[in-house]
């Protein structure tokens, strides 16, 4: 275990991803908020924590509570802690994704740059504008970990599915807006590891279970323990699937407008 950790910290790619992250987001280290984030400091902590809980974002609520408990509840201190978590999560997500896909992509440059385009895109840039950016980017790291375990399950042992479900559940408890990323990336591995139509359909069902079960559990927890349930209402499966398809097209076909169309599919 110690050797593996040492190997990671000796890998130059980790530091290159770190440099890229700082170049993109370093300017946001100073205290600046999206308009919604000012609400955090304009009302009692308990009220905003309750809003997080009603939204199913238990980890976000815990983050806010811990910051207040450790006397980190001032705007500057909380923002700094959140920014550091976001930077670490962004670097870790890109590095893990790179190590997952490098065996599948012969072109080393593309194998290196694709994780950057997936993790650092127009959606994640927007997340960095919020006070709770740390937990939001942490949810992206959790989604990448979920893909990692899902890939392991398709390759070797279905027991890894439990870890994948657990990671998706934690991501739901952090920020549900990133969960579609898990489905988009995992769908590629479903295609890769399906030897026939029957296996393809079965793997898609498994993928659906890994996505839906944590969402239902998250919704159930909120429904049982909080009277008003989710602020945004119930789970809309059709809308969720539609959103996933939109994200899939944005990444696989449009390449977020950063590269020529269909390049990811060609690779």
For the regions a language model picked out, list residue spans one by one.
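Membrane-interfacial loop-to-transmembrane alpha-helix junctions, especially the N-terminal start
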Residues: 12-15, 51, 104-113, 157-161, ...
């Amino acid at each position: 275990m110690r050797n593996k950790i040492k190997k990671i910290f000796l890998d130059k790619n980790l530091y290159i991803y770190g440099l890229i992250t700082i170049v993109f987001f370093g300017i946001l280290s100073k205290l600046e908020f999206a308009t919604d984030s000012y609400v955090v400091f304009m009302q009692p902590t308990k009220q905003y924590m309750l809003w997080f809980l009603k939204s199913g974002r238990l980890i976000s609520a815990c983050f806010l509570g811990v910051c207040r408990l450790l006397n980190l509840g001032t705007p500057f201190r909380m923002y700094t802690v959140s920014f550091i978590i976001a930077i670490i999560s962004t670097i870790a997500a890109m590095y893990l994704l790179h190590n997952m896909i490098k065996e599948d992509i012969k072109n080393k440059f593309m194998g290196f740059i694709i994780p950057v385009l997936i993790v650092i895109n127009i959606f994640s840039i927007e997340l960095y504008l919020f006070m709770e950016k740390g937990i939001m980017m942490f949810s992206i790291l959790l989604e990448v970990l979920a893909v990692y375990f899902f890939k392991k399950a398709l390759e070797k042992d279905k027991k890894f599915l439990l870890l994948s479900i657990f990671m998706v559940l934690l991501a739901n408890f952090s920020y549900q807006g990133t969960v579609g990323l898990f489905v988009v990336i995992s769908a590629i591995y479903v295609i890769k590891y399906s030897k026939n139509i029957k296996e393809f359909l079965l793997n898609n069902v498994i993928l659906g279970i890994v996505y839906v079960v944590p969402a239902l559990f998250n919704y159930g927890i909120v429904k049982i323990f909080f009277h008003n349930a989710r602020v945004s209402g119930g789970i809309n499966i059709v809308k969720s699937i539609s959103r996933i398809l939109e994200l899939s097209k944005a990444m696989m076909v449009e390449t977020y407008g950063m590269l020529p169309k269909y390049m990811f599919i060609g690779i």
